From Swiss-Prot:
Keyword Ribosomal protein applies: yes
Name of protein: Small ribosomal subunit protein uS2
GO BP term (any one): translation
Example of a GO MF term: structural constituent of ribosome
Gene3D superfamilies, A to Z: Glucose-6-phosphate isomerase like protein, domain 1
Family: Belongs to the universal ribosomal protein uS2 family.
Pfam families: Ribosomal_S2
Alphabetized HAMAP family for the sequence: Ribosomal_uS2_A
Amino acid sequence: MSELLIPLDKYLAAGLHIGTQQKTKDMEKYIYRVRADGLHVLDVKSSNDKIIVAAKLLSKYEPDDILVVSTRQYGQSPVKKFGEVTGTKTIPGRFIPGTLTNPQYAKFIEPKILVVTDPRSDSQAVIEAKQNGIPVVALCDTENLLCNVDVVIPVNNKGRKAIALVYWLLARQILRERGILSSDEEFDLEPTDFELKI
């Protein structure tokens, strides 16, 4: 277990721990408690530790070999900003079937690892990655199934602020792992820079 990347209150303010009223057996181990209204609350320590694990893994790949996908509206701005900061390929918005499997498709790409904002809404990308043996890192909420997911980041993958915070933390950690930022150096961007503006 590692130290928190940011103070606990910042995680809580972004709603990173807020799950849904549904839960899957797969996600049970990441659930801290169930509120009286039936809402499942994620364990912030698990979220924090999995962000660190994912960043370490992603930092071992060339930026050009990483594809980050989000069909979910609140994930599109964070994914674009993450791509700008880390140099990774991104597909914010609709994922066209065949992007990873059809060499005849004009925008066909062959990443070595895939990151998705929600394995359910980004299921086409996950399926194509699995067909090609590409590992999948996924932001997963309490109701997600983990089949075809290799690295789980247990977080609220529906909230605008929560998704932005996760991609901000991932970007910062990857830059630290790559030695672009030192561990005590401040990141010159804020989580709000990753948020969808409404």
